[in-house]
Amino acid sequence: MATINQLVRKPRVRQVTKSNVPALQACPQRRGVCTRVYTTTPKKPNSALRKVARVRLTNGFEVTSYIGGEGHNLQEHSVILIRGGRVKDLPGVRYHTVRGALDCSGVSDRRQGRSKYGAKRPKS
């Protein structure tokens, strides 16, 4: 335990935690323009064609964002909203596209978990 005199001379240093989503710069979401929309394959035990987009954000960052859900309407120059959240089996993908916001449409025919995919409530 440090004495009060020691703490006056040299105060305790706060530990700085590194952000998992640096491109958001402490914002909940960021807007950006798709520069490339493509599919990529996941890490070893899994196998698929995951849909991702390279996005140039309004703050100048260029990041890779995962496009969740079945089917999408994104192409180059689409304006999208991204949020934090990594994809465990895609190295370097730390952001998710927000479905149903800006140019990105919601998932059609989605019945459960609709809010995560920007799907409206179906007519009974």
UniProtKB/Swiss-Prot annotation:
Family, similarity comment: Belongs to the universal ribosomal protein uS12 family.
Keywords: Methylation, Ribonucleoprotein, Ribosomal protein, RNA-binding, rRNA-binding, tRNA-binding
Membrane spanning residue stretches: none
InterPro entries: NA-bd_OB-fold, Ribosomal_uS12, Ribosomal_uS12_bac
GO CC annotations on file: small ribosomal subunit
GO-annotated biological processes: translation
Compositionally biased tracts (Basic residues): 113-124
Its job: With S4 and S5 plays an important role in translational accuracy. Interacts with and stabilizes bases of the 16S rRNA that are involved in tRNA selection in the A site and with the mRNA backbone. Located at the interface of the 30S and 50S subunits, it traverses the body of the 30S subunit contacting proteins on the other side and probably holding the rRNA structure together. The combined cluster of proteins S8, S12 and S17 appears to hold together the shoulder and platform of the 30S subunit.
Name of the molecule in the record: Small ribosomal subunit protein uS12
MF-aspect GO terms: rRNA binding; structural constituent of ribosome; tRNA binding
Phylogenetic lineage: Bacteria, Pseudomonadati, Pseudomonadota, Gammaproteobacteria, Alteromonadales
Subunit structure: Part of the 30S ribosomal subunit. Contacts proteins S8 and S17. May interact with IF1 in the 30S initiation complex.
Modified residues (3-methylthioaspartic acid): D89
Any one Pfam family match given in the protein's UniProt record, by short name: Ribosom_S12_S23
Residue span of region Disordered: 105-124
